Structures are given as C-alpha cells and as structure tokens.
Amino acid sequence: MSEVGRMRNLGPVSERMLNAVGVHTTPELRELGAVNAYRLLTLRGHTPSLNLVWAIEAALMDIHWMDLPPETKARLKAELEAPWDARALLEDGDGEEEDG
C-alpha cells in the first residue's frame, strides 16, 4: 500500500488510480491538489467521480469527506468548471508529456 492509500477517505481503487498517474505520497497529492488530480486522472483515461474530488480534498484536510464544508465543495466545483491548460498539467503533473 502506498502512502496515498493510507490517507483518510482514499480506498484501494482511488490509490490505484492515483498511483497510475504518478501520485504515491501525501506531498505529491498536496502539490497537485484535488482538482488537478481529478483532471490528470481524466486526461490519463480514468473516469473519476466528483466524490473523488471531495475525498481527496477532505483527505488533505484530514477530515471525513462527508464533513467537507459546502463552501469548499462549491469552490472545488467552480475550479473544475473553469478553463484550464491540459498541456501544462501534463508537463507539470507527472513530468511526462504524452504525444498527440
């Protein structure tokens, strides 16, 4: 089990997805953030749910995902809906840029 798999709210499926995109430690996940982790997962062909965003954010705050404040959920949802640069995320997200 990786360090990410021992974080609160993150089970084996979340751990496998995050590990597959190069996220193995709490500092790596903290640097990437919940929204960019979700984006990186989708760019790499995974189909995470919005609940994973809540779970990651809550894990980083060390609280149960159901205790995530509504204003935090609203902020995260707004960030997800905002324009973003996929190329920059691929370059910064795991150090490997995909062709195409």
Regions found by a protein language model. Give the residues of each.
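Sterile Alpha Motif
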Residues: 1-8
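Structure-specific DNA junction-binding interface
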Residues: 5, 16-20, 31, 35-100
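An amphipathic, hydrophobic-aromatic interaction surface with interspersed Lys/Arg
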Residues: 26
